[in-house]
From Swiss-Prot:
The keyword Lipid metabolism applies. The record marks 143 as: Transition state stabilizer. GO terms for biological process: bile acid catabolic process; lipid catabolic process. NADP(+) binds at residues 17-21, 40-41, 66-67, 240. The keyword Nucleotide-binding applies. It comes from Mediterraneibacter gnavus (Ruminococcus gnavus). This is 7beta-hydroxysteroid dehydrogenase. GO terms for molecular function: 7-beta-hydroxysteroid dehydrogenase (NADP+) activity; nucleotide binding. 7beta-hydroxysteroid dehydrogenase that catalyzes the reduction of the 7-oxo group of 7-oxo-lithocholate (7-oxo-LCA), to yield ursodeoxycholate (UDCA). As R.gnavus is a common core bacterium of the human gut microbiota, this enzyme contributes to the formation of UDCA in the human colon. UDCA is regarded as a chemopreventive beneficial secondary bile acid due to its low hydrophobicity; it protects hepatocytes and bile duct epithelial cells against necrosis and apoptosis induced by more hydrophobic secondary bile acids like deoxycholate (DCA).
Amino acid sequence: MTLREKYGEWGIILGATEGVGKAFCERLAKEGMNVVMVGRREEKLKELGEELKNTYEIDYKVVKADFSLPDATDKIFAATENLDMGFMAYVACLHSFGKIQDTPWEKHEAMINVNVVTFMKCFYHYMKIFAAQDRGAVINVSSMTGISSSPWNGQYGAGKAFILKMTEAVACETEKTNVDVEVITLGTTLTPSLLSNLPGGPQGEAVMKTAQTPEEVVDEAFEKLGKELSVISGERNKASVHDWKANHTEDDYIRYMGSFYQE
């Protein structure tokens, strides 16, 4: 059974332009679902939409939206109002490196909107639809920083922790329904952003050896959908979390994560 047959005609990817979001779009289209692609780079999304339409004979919509704005969801919800919605993935994120007091409040507010407020509005909106029709699926994307916290990148980790715990709770609430909900927690992933900032030498080589591709992440997410509520992506990441929780204190884990960003 394809995703379209199981969940409905349309899926929405929030943060669809590249990386994991793009891989979600490709997976939906491959399984016959029409795709609503939401992001800031409208032309790039249209190019992706045409590529998917020509390859998989699906339909698409592009919604240009800035997730950091308080009214970001207005045009998103309007664009999907009359569609047979069956899937949602929230991939969008925003972070800023530095100590809390050294980051301008405007940046903090933007991160709260992207990582918490807009996420929650979208999750609430589409869950109401899926629950009412007793059909649909949600996969939200968290990060290892949401498990450990992320010193010098604190708001990002806190936002990902909110996505992680909120989605886990809703996933449990929907277990005995026909709505499948899952959160997938990512480690290092080979997105265009990572590749453009990859350090040279042994450090960069080490990252390349452990990182997953967006396609690997999305494949695992769908493999576990309807079977597990909360997934840590990749065997290395699963083993790492297990080791730290079994053999180290929470303080050790926090300081370890902080060592990656400490100024």
